[in-house]
Amino acid sequence: MEILNNLAERVISGEKLTKEEGLQILSIPDELVMDLVEEASKVRKYFFKNQMEFCSLINAKNGACTEDCSFCAQSSHYKTPINAYGLVSKDEMLAGAEKAVAINANRYCIVVSGRKASKEEVDKIADAIKEIKKTYPIKVCCSLGTVDEKDLDKLKVAGVDRINHNLETSEKYFSKIVSTHTWKERYKTIKKIQKVGLSTCTGGIFGMGESDEDIIDLAMTYRDLEVDSIPLNFLIPIPGTPLGDKHNLTPLRCLKIIALFRLFNPKSEIRLCGGRELNLKDYHDIAFEVANCLMAGGYLTRAGREPGKDEEMARRLGRELIKNGASFSVSNE
């Protein structure tokens, strides 16, 4: 296909792909997906060489969420098989950081359920961050829902390195999956994060019934925002949620989406997270010809694969893991 001609060279030179070209990328025939991966891989190698980063998270507050996100097990609107609990202790947050270091994660994210963390919760998390930064050689991220500038300043002083807040899908499609808050609220939160000078991590979930245009709109929004990290999640249908019986993704469809985000956001980290194992299947390793980061050690309400398998993959692919500001080859031990 013509869209594949000199595609990587155009992106590397600084050319911005158009929405029409994005539509062509997502409609590439399955037999040409490996050619698309090759082009996107050239872009990844140019900007990130052979480096790979692991991150890990702690589900620091689970369930009882007032929001009605159709994909989420933690919403109080649905009957789902989860164990709700309040904010964990500082010791538990520190223990999570220790586990993250042990699996060679370069980042550790403290995640809480709910639309917005309370002032008390922010204070406790900030206190834990200070202790983590003194104790462990790891970058600390937070995902606390909607945050105001005072909270962000407090977290920044504590030593947080990055804030996660996902847009999830396009502005046009968002109201189809969430009714209790707006896409604009999430967008404004990202702008606040950038305003205080913190690194941004913001991504999406795919397989929720969105169109090709929705996917491209999200990729272009992140390009306009110049975000640092884009976590890509692929729907894990959760019984009890409105999307509990939806599963229309194929591995090749996932590869097209990953390649699209790399080509539209060449300088952003492309981080594969929830649903990567379930949806990519035998193409899992191939996806990391394009992506350069991953979430290791499990997700919020679902287990991932053993971290050792991700290290084995990094070794097979000849990648160097980034850890504590340096990169190293994964040993065979």
Swiss-Prot record:
Entries under InterPro entries matching the protein: Aldolase_TIM, BATS_dom, Biotin_synth/BioAB, Biotin_synthase, Elp3/MiaA/NifB-like_rSAM, rSAM
Pathway(s) served: Cofactor biosynthesis; biotin biosynthesis; biotin from 7,8-diaminononanoate: step 2/2
GO biological process: biotin biosynthetic process
Keywords on record: 2Fe-2S, 4Fe-4S, Biotin biosynthesis, Iron, Iron-sulfur, Metal-binding, S-adenosyl-L-methionine, Transferase
EC supergroup of this enzyme: transferase
UniProt: [4Fe-4S] cluster binding residues: C65, C69, C72
GO molecular function: 2 iron, 2 sulfur cluster binding; 4 iron, 4 sulfur cluster binding; biotin synthase activity; iron ion binding
EC number from the UniProt entry: 2.8.1.6
Pfam families cross-referenced by the UniProt entry: BATS, Radical_SAM
Domain of life: Bacteria
Residue ranges constituting the Radical SAM core domain according to the UniProt record: 47-276
Cofactor: [4Fe-4S] cluster; [2Fe-2S] cluster
Cofactor: binding comment: Binds 1 [4Fe-4S] cluster. The cluster is coordinated with 3 cysteines and an exchangeable S-adenosyl-L-methionine. Binds 1 [2Fe-2S] cluster. The cluster is coordinated with 3 cysteines and 1 arginine.
Catalytic activity: (4R,5S)-dethiobiotin + (sulfur carrier)-SH + 2 reduced [2Fe-2S]-[ferredoxin] + 2 S-adenosyl-L-methionine = (sulfur carrier)-H + biotin + 2 5'-deoxyadenosine + 2 L-methionine + 2 oxidized [2Fe-2S]-[ferredoxin]
Residues given in the record as [2Fe-2S] cluster binding sites: C109, C141, C201, R271
Subunit-level organization: Homodimer.
Family to which the UniProt record says this protein belongs: Belongs to the radical SAM superfamily. Biotin synthase family.
Function: Catalyzes the conversion of dethiobiotin (DTB) to biotin by the insertion of a sulfur atom into dethiobiotin via a radical-based mechanism.
NCBIfam families noted in UniProt: bioB (TIGR00433)
Protein name from the UniProt record: Biotin synthase
